[in-house]
Amino acid sequence: MARSPVLIINCKNYKEAAGGRIDSLAAAAAGAAAKYGVRIALAPPQHLLGAVKGEDLTVLAQHIDDKGVGSTTGYVVPELLGESGVSGALINHSEHRVSADQVASLVPRLRGLDMISVVCVKDSAEAANLSRHRPDYIAIEPPELIGSGRSVSSERPELIGEAAEAIRGADGTKLLCGAGITSGADVRKALELGSKGILVASGVVKSSDPAAAIAELAQAMS
């Protein structure tokens, strides 16, 4: 998923992504990716990961556990995700945070599996700390703006620049921004400030017209 910019859609456990509705989201995302020439990744609810793996999309898990293959009932194991066609995972999302030690273990583990790591952080200090492990992406998301409809690029624009500076020494790590992103204007501002892509959730999945929302964000990246 090295091509920039990238749009990651986190479906969380929203009912709007349940059942057959994930198929509509995946089709809309694949269509927008082809039309606008941007990379789009979808992170469906964990039990629906297999439902979208056949689409022309990058599929990410919303969370992984630092557990091994074998007798680890209920845990999400990176190796098995890779065997199932999943391309990578979000790590340390604000709704499912893990320890710094787990990040330090999981990022190189995904790298060894040729899988994508997207490490979520709440501020530039955490970005600096966790970028030392050289994940593919650091996603800056102030928790107070997540799901608020108030975008980080308009409410906290300085944070994007600070985070970009914080990860500058992490070779190969790209910055994403999330929290409150709902419009093409939000996307364009974030890219101007140094972000290489967007992590979005409710702004797409809970939109009255998810396909139109995806198209607007993708077009702003093209």
Swiss-Prot record:
Keyword tags: Cytoplasm, Gluconeogenesis, Glycolysis, Isomerase
Gene3D superfamilies: Aldolase class I
InterPro entries: Aldolase_TIM, TIM_sf, Triosephosphate_isomerase, Triosephosphate_isomerase_arc
GO terms for biological process, alphabetical: gluconeogenesis; glycolytic process
Pfam families found in the cross-reference section: TIM
Residue sites binding substrate per the record: N10, C11, K12, I146, G180, A201, S202
Catalysed reactions listed for this entry: D-glyceraldehyde 3-phosphate = dihydroxyacetone phosphate
GO molecular function: triose-phosphate isomerase activity
Signal peptide span: none
Active site per the UniProt annotation: H93, E141
Subcellular location(s) of the protein: Cytoplasm
Metabolic or biological pathway: Carbohydrate biosynthesis; gluconeogenesis; Carbohydrate degradation; glycolysis; D-glyceraldehyde 3-phosphate from glycerone phosphate: step 1/1
Main location: cytoplasm
The enzyme's E.C. designation: 5.3.1.1
Cellular component GO terms held in the UniProt record: cytoplasm
Purpose: Involved in the gluconeogenesis. Catalyzes stereospecifically the conversion of dihydroxyacetone phosphate (DHAP) to D-glyceraldehyde-3-phosphate (G3P).
Subunit field text: Homotetramer; dimer of dimers.
Similarity comment: family membership: Belongs to the triosephosphate isomerase family.
UniProt xrefs under HAMAP family: TIM_A (MF_00147_A)
Protein name, entry field: Triosephosphate isomerase
Organism: Cenarchaeum symbiosum (strain A)
